[in-house]
Amino acid sequence: MLWGGHDSGALELRKRASGAFALRGRFPYNKAAVLSDGGRTGRPRKEVMASRAFAYRINKRDEDIHLLVGHSYDRPLASRSAGTLDIRDGDDAVTFEAQIAPEMQEVTYVRDFLGGMTAGLIVGLSPGFRIPPERAVPDAEKVEEEEPSQGMALIRTIFAALLYEMSLVTRPAYPETQIEARNWTPTEGGLVVPEGPRSGLNRTLNRWRA
């Protein structure tokens, strides 16, 4: 599972007369997220979700999608299957509204989440997704080099992805394992070259042989 992120503060929490909380959020398309600044010697890496990149599973109403705290399925807030998550796809963004019932508010991690969000500590929205198999979607992604006038980053644009969950986080974060799980190999023309299934193993063996 890959994690994306947009630290936008586009989250809104309101309490209804019933005692339930209504949580609304918005994840924008076509906005570059900086996954890595490249460190001292590397190149920055950015990721862009193209318009309606998450449309497939969102538009299939029988596909379950979860709203989680920190990408943990042990800390769910809402889901489609439970009837507590309404998520919609649009040209400019994915939007959702979740209902957090009074009973859920008594759960420790939910209470902690509500406290953190009310205090302004939880402002990030991060999708959990997978890239579909190449046999199903041949051109799901591409990697290009940034215009020299704008910088030297590698930019990965995702056109189709399978969305499984949205997570509320303190800020979107990208561990090194997450960054390396992505394909960052451009061709001379700037398009991605899919790596073979043994490419990671071959790179490791080559390092030991050197």
Task: Go through the PLM ranges and name each one.
Residues 193-210:
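Enriched but not universal
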